[in-house]
Amino acid sequence: MESKSEQNEWSSGVWAHLTAVRQQSPLVQCITNFVSMDLVANTLLSAGASPAMVHSVVEIPDFTPHIHALCVNVGTLTPDWLPSMKAAAELASQLRKPWVLDPAAVSCSGFRLKACLELIELKPTVIKGNGSEIIALSSASRGQTKGADSSHESTDAIEAAKSLAMSSGAVVAVSGAVDIVTDGKQVIGVHNGTKMMQQITATGCSLAGLIVAFLAIDSSRVLEATVSAMAVFGIAGELGEAMANGPASLRMHLIDCLYGLDETTVLKRVNVTRLG
Amino acid sequence: MESKSEQNEWSSGVWAHLTAVRQQSPLVQCITNFVSMDLVANTLLSAGASPAMVHSVVEIPDFTPHIHALCVNVGTLTPDWLPSMKAAAELASQLRKPWVLDPAAVSCSGFRLKACLELIELKPTVIKGNGSEIIALSSASRGQTKGADSSHESTDAIEAAKSLAMSSGAVVAVSGAVDIVTDGKQVIGVHNGTKMMQQITATGCSLAGLIVAFLAIDSSRVLEATVSAMAVFGIAGELGEAMANGPASLRMHLIDCLYGLDETTVLKRVNVTRLG
Amino acid sequence: MESKSEQNEWSSGVWAHLTAVRQQSPLVQCITNFVSMDLVANTLLSAGASPAMVHSVVEIPDFTPHIHALCVNVGTLTPDWLPSMKAAAELASQLRKPWVLDPAAVSCSGFRLKACLELIELKPTVIKGNGSEIIALSSASRGQTKGADSSHESTDAIEAAKSLAMSSGAVVAVSGAVDIVTDGKQVIGVHNGTKMMQQITATGCSLAGLIVAFLAIDSSRVLEATVSAMAVFGIAGELGEAMANGPASLRMHLIDCLYGLDETTVLKRVNVTRLG
């Protein structure tokens, strides 16, 4: 059982992170998919960050040096977008800016899997996926070709996440009924969030964007910043669902709640535990 | 006048189709336009289907064999997207997976009209458009070049729809004040829906996506599955409008209502008639 | 102090413009960024206009001659989109159709700044940006390379806007706490709107789209039509914020309010002053 003081520590850390995002309004570059651009941008704005959906390879040398952190999401990947993603990721890594890889639907093609493995070579700070995506990536990173099974629950993905974290050097975040965050040694569970959030497209991408904003303001504590972002997004979803009649109103209330989230609510609702 | 037993048959068919979509959660690949990706995905999710917005030509050989059905929408067509659409459509036809063509704004250019005619050669299961689009396609299929007049009501388009259905082998669905579905012989009218739905961008595209999901779970009864999808979408719009203050809240309530639609409401509200 | 009769003149002008948009439903072509396509289209629909998100360079010769006005927004510019923007802008100028340039994030790269300067050569009717964007463009138009500082308030941008208007021949609109519209001589302030609108992505792009619709129905009075569009959008935002719990519900209510805006409300709320 989690000690009360440790739970309090997580809670106050989450609130400190959210406050810092609101105060510093980090500039977050997103190279994300077409489906999620709108919701990712609105998620970041409602959290207090400054999103910039800049994806042209010709703009990266000028723009990426000015950002605080980067999000790369392969959800609607085509070959012409990959050079931009690589250029931005490489530059971010060189300049020691944190960046997150969201390997959305990584198993849908050999092309996409290969692209994600190449992006992992560029040293993402965090890899954020669902259970199936993390299992597929972890297997492929070990040279295995077993396909992903989308029925994997995130808790089943713990070993895959730890393995991927060890081999890649990234913190790995797995969204699911219980969100998992691991650096390969520690395993943290985030129990916030609701099932209906999965009925809204682009919530996973938006969570990845939010993690980027939190990394931007605490890049030395990657595991903790990632946990904080997942807890904040989950709490906004819980509050939103209490007001919602279905997924579309949940989507609206989630963003409103993220915007209005206050200290009392955060401290009361953060539900984070050590799983290993 | 429609017999009561025939109306009951349509109603119970609509409910059976919706239930099957929810239970089977078919995987629906959408190659659609930039404007509609978000709403199409959320419409499919709220109906219980699994949308996948995969459009890269390099991913189609790996991915399309795993889908249950395909949606192709030319709303923001550029020459570089057409090969993907053709490759996916051709593969879907080969593998006997149903696919829907939405010839959005087909008359806006010679390029787009030609592209749609080429796609029709690949044997769509259903062609879904508004009256103007269907009239333009039907004329062009007969070698006529008369431009479309956007003032055509869907009921005026019946003859064009029948002709296009006969020449293409597709079931043709025409959205409008009364939705029309025809296989070239039978003509069915779907009287559900509200006028304000036309004030929301991408509702037509979302309806096309929904038809795909319904075809996925009953591909042997194309006419009936198409009617069911149109009735369900229309009913969700009616329920949504009763709660809405304008098009943006209608959009939200429509998705929520689609998600929550129950048997009693479906059986009571389905309004389908034989027109010929 | 503004005379009451002058204020009344602005108010009745705004209402006359909105009424004309609703009655004439102008066809507005938008070549805009991926993030904003959905909201721009819904803004135009809710105002009574007909949006068409047609951006392929191969479609412009067929399509652009039929439009009433054009919107060009560089928010997610890549080199392959620029020829379309130029072709459409050039054709619009040739055919004396009004067009608006939204130089979104113009300072994010040398490529984007150069593209905007080239587009300005094609004689936009209106250039709409925030203070930083207008200052950056104005400096660059004078051959200066000083970067934009995003902390500039729109009122600080008056001189830059006047200078850009004089050099380009366009009316320049600057969104901010007080919106500014100038033809280089007259300077008009629009005091409608709320701060929270900046927490929603694509509101600036949507305002640009709305200006296009208003130009379409009164192309001979560019300054006045631009002021009207900004006042209408601002009023919709004020009404929306009164009903909102955060940015996502504001976004919904804004569109609903734009759709339902009536004469009494417009006449009462328009807040326009001469600043110079």
Curated annotation (Swiss-Prot), chains A, B, C:
Its EC number is 2.7.1.50. The keyword Lipoprotein does not apply. Pathway: Cofactor biosynthesis; thiamine diphosphate biosynthesis; 4-methyl-5-(2-phosphoethyl)-thiazole from 5-(2-hydroxyethyl)-4-methylthiazole: step 1/1. Substrate binds at residues 53, 202. One of its GO terms (molecular function) is hydroxyethylthiazole kinase activity. It catalyses: 5-(2-hydroxyethyl)-4-methylthiazole + ATP = 4-methyl-5-(2-phosphooxyethyl)-thiazole + ADP + H(+). InterPro entries: Hyethyz_kinase, Ribokinase-like. Its cofactor is Mg(2+). Pfam families: HK. Disruption phenotype: No visible phenotype. The keyword Methyltransferase does not apply. Thiazole kinase involved in thiamine salvage pathway. Belongs to the Thz kinase family. This is Hydroxyethylthiazole kinase. It comes from Arabidopsis thaliana (Mouse-ear cress). The lineage of its organism: Eukaryota, Viridiplantae, Streptophyta, Embryophyta, Tracheophyta.
